[in-house]
Each structure stands twice: as C-alpha cells, then as structure tokens.
Amino acid sequence: MPTRKSVTPRKPGRPCPNGGVVILVLLSLGLAALPAACAAGPGSGVAAITPLVKSRDEWRRLLPPERFDILFEEGTERAGTSPLNEEKRAGSFVCAACFLPLFESKEKFNSGTGWPSFSDFIPGSLETKHDYRLFTPRTEYHCARCGGHQGHVFDDGIPPTGKRYCNNGLALVFVPAGEPLPALRQ
C-alpha cells in the first residue's frame, strides 16, 4: 500500500510560517485556508491583522446612521456626493469604522464614476467576497479588520494593476500626510 507523503505547499522562495501548526489547521479546515495561511506572517511582508469583533448594535451606536448603512448594511452612497472625490493631497485613507489604513493617496485616480477610486490597496487590509445582488456577479471588498463594506473592485482601472477599487466615500476617513493616523478602534 502506498504511503502518503506530507507536503507543505508554499510559494517559491517564501516558506510557509509555522509549518506544523498550519498543516493541522488546514486539515481541520479542509485545506481551504492554505493561500491565506501562507500569504501573511513572518517573511511575507504583510502583517497579520487581528480582527475587531463588535455586534451590529455596537457599530450602530458608534457610527452615524449613514456610515453604519454603508459599512454594515452594504449600502451605497449616491455617486458624486463624497468630498473625497476631490481629495488630491498626499495622505492615507483609513476605514471609517475601525481606522485601519486601507489606501494611500498615490493609488487614487479619477475614474469618472463619481466615487473615490484606487488602483491598489495596502497589502493585507482588504478581503473580498462575491456579490450576486445584481444581474452580473461582482466582487465586493471590505476591511480585513472590522468587515466594514467599502465598495466593489472592477477590472477597468489604470496600470499597473488594471484594477479599480470603487469606494464609498463615507466608508473612509482621509488623513493628510504628516498628521498622525488615528489609533485603531478597540
């Protein structure tokens, strides 16, 4: 009878952190978590983000109603209504719920859509899921720390990524370069 060989898949030149622990966790999760397990951690250049868990009622108490609707009810603000569309200063855009930095101003571009748009994000700051609420499936993205809905990503952006992260302005807070970032919400 052939024996099974234990192999830890990894990206070339990048070892998977905590190999033995990762294998045990992956076996219990059906190997579905392998890409994420090897993408972050020691040697990856991406810091692990500790999730911020709050109930919907807690978020409702902390946020103005229009921000809560977008961030935790997956609402969308009207196109052209966000002052962040015109923001051109150097700085960072952070999640309006938990204050995790999501985008740098150097990635912002005018997409002509009426929403703040970015060609790339800070590594590890966003997660995605499929959104089937319209006739055509879309990819929704949200803050990796608090799960707050930010917007949708499309393949009609500018080089070098070709991506357009189309963000609700109310889901972001702009922090000008040289000013301290807000402390992460606890």
State the predicted function of each range.
Residues 1-17:
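N-terminal secretory signal peptides that target proteins for export/translocation
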Residues 13, 43, 180-181:
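Extended beta-strand/loop cores of jelly-roll/beta-sandwich
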Residues 19-33:
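Bacterial N-terminal signal peptides
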Residues 8, 22-26, 95:
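N-terminal non-cleavable signal-anchor helices
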Residues 30-47:
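Bacterial Sec-dependent signal peptides at the C-terminal "C-region" and cleavage site
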Residues 42-58:
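Short N-terminal segments immediately surrounding and downstream of signal-peptide cleavage
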Residues 50-51, 60-94, 99-186:
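A short Gly-Trp-Pro
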